[in-house]
Amino acid sequence: MSLRLNISGVRKSYNGKPVLNACSFSFDRNGVYVLTGSNGSGKSTLLRICALIESPDNGEVIYFSGNNIISKDILLRRRITLVLPGIGLFNTTVFNNAAYGLKIRGGKNKETERKVNNALKFVGLIHKKNHNALTLSSGEIQRLGIARAMAIEPEMLFLDEPTASIDNENTEIVENIILNMKKEGRSKTIIATHDMLQAGRLGDCMLLMDEGKIIKV
Ligand SMILES: Nc1ncnc2c1ncn2[C@@H]1O[C@H](COP(=O)(O)OP(=O)(O)OP(=O)(O)O)[C@@H](O)[C@H]1O
Ligand SMILES: [Mg+2]
């Protein structure tokens, strides 16, 4: 049963300043949702709250499978993931970095290897699997972050500024990765981006953060 997310009346303030203000939305359909909005409008905050990294001050963040509410336990957390613009790298191979999410989830070795190799192929980094991750370019690092997330086959994938500070060539590669994931149609991807043209290229559903709320555009 596909995972759905409903947020309602979500409020979040930092140091007394409201960032999310009774923000509500239902992520019901598989595909790509693109969230745009000015700097500081709360996009990253919203992604962290949706990905269960942070809790709202008020309001509800509810995951459903069909019509059943799913408790926010480790099993649910294994089905969702957030990729941040500067992913943390470990001083080891590209393969080990991409395998990290699966290893902490206790994946079996053979299965882990298959999934990680597939994810590295998907993002065009398989030829670098034995290289030290610290030698990658910023575009490749961004792709490695996506591979690490894809290896766990998330049903809900949150990408925060996936092409921030990478060149046109790598932006195109990352966009193609996202479009290819979309073709597979198995997951929901929620992307925060400043780039309106990119939003148009990738999104099935366009969302705008405005005054602490999501507006569908
Ligand atoms: N952990 C935090 N502590 C204090 N203030 C925070 C924290 N996280 C976010 N903020 C503040 O909340 C507001 C919204 O920040 P957020 O990062 O969610 O916006 P954004 O839309 O992602 O911005 P950008 O486009 O620059 O990435 C900003 O004013 C930011 O300074
Ligand atoms: Mg942000």
Positions of PLM-derived features:
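The feature captures the beta-strand-to-loop junction immediately N-terminal to the Walker
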Residues: 36-38
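Helix-to-loop junction immediately C-terminal to a conserved catalytic motif
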Residues: 51
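ABC ATPase NBD coupling module
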Residues: 67-81
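Conserved ABC ATPase "signature" region
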Residues: 110-128
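Conserved ABC ATPase signature
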Residues: 132-136, 140
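Catalytic Walker B motif of ABC-type/P-loop ATPase nucleotide-binding domains
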Residues: 157-160
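H-loop/switch region of ABC-family ATPase nucleotide-binding domains
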Residues: 193-194
